[in-house]
């Protein structure tokens, strides 16, 4: 399940499919459909919408449908990690672990929260580190949303420059986000060869 930030994953793989073609093509349905590679927008909501816990039961209801053939489940945050407490994240991790134990044939993908510009001392980073440590220690599968937004495609690191989810960052250390690493990278690389045009909610 996802809302707007999680939609970046779907629009991204859809654009890769259009840009590169086979073997990156895939089948898609908006809702549940057996035999389809990606069932999008089902279950509805995200990890904090309408609350921080009901997504787990919606996952059970989804997987318990007759004929269900899903072997991967991935839930996305929107902005809820930014104001999450340690207890909130413990709840998330515990619910994920319970689902893994109940459905051993399904791979559950954990996720960090997207960047919010608060830097390495902000609550978001602390909570993301909590998720990362749990996944590392437990051998979990993690889609590290924040980490992806922290590096450009050449591996240049922006995490210490207060980057946000739009790829804006503080270029000169004055506390103002005055540059955008995604636009800079695109402008120095060739469209259609190094990168492709793709809509991305909230981002470049």
Language-model segment annotations:
Residues 1, 6, 24-31, 37-43, ...:
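Structural recognition of the beta-strand scaffold that forms the well-ordered cores
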Residues 5, 9-12, 73, 88-95, ...:
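Stable alpha-helical elements in mature extracytoplasmic
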Residues 34-57, 157-163:
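Charged, often glycine-rich, active-site loop that binds/positions anionic groups
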Residues 52-89, 116:
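Oxyanion-hole/transition-state-stabilizing segment in secreted/luminal serine hydrolases
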Residues 165-204:
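Histidine-centered active-site loop/cap adjacent to the catalytic His
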């Amino acid at each position: 399940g996802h809302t707007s930030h999680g939609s970046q994953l779907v629009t991204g793989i859809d654009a890769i499919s259009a840009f590169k073609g086979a073997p990156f093509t895939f089948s898609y349905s908006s809702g549940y459909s057996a035999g389809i590679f990606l069932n999008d927008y089902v279950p509805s909501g995200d990890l904090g919408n309408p609350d921080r816990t009901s997504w787990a039961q919606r996952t059970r209801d989804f997987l318990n449908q007759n004929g269900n053939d899903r072997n991967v489940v991935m839930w996305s945050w929107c902005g809820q990690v930014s104001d999450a407490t340690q207890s909130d994240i413990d709840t998330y991790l515990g619910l994920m672990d319970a689902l893994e134990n109940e459905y051993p044939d399904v791979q559950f993908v954990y996720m960090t929260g997207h960047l919010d510009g608060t830097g390495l001392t902000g609550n978001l980073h602390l909570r993301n580190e909590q998720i990362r440590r749990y996944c590392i220690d437990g051998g979990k599968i993690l889609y590290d949303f924040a980490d992806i937004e922290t590096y450009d495609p050449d591996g240049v690191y922006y995490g210490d420059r207060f980057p946000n989810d739009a790829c804006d960052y503080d270029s000169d250390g004055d506390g103002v986000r005055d540059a955008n690493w995604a636009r800079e990278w695109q402008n120095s690389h060739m469209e259609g060869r190094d990168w492709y045009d793709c809509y991305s909610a909230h981002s470049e």
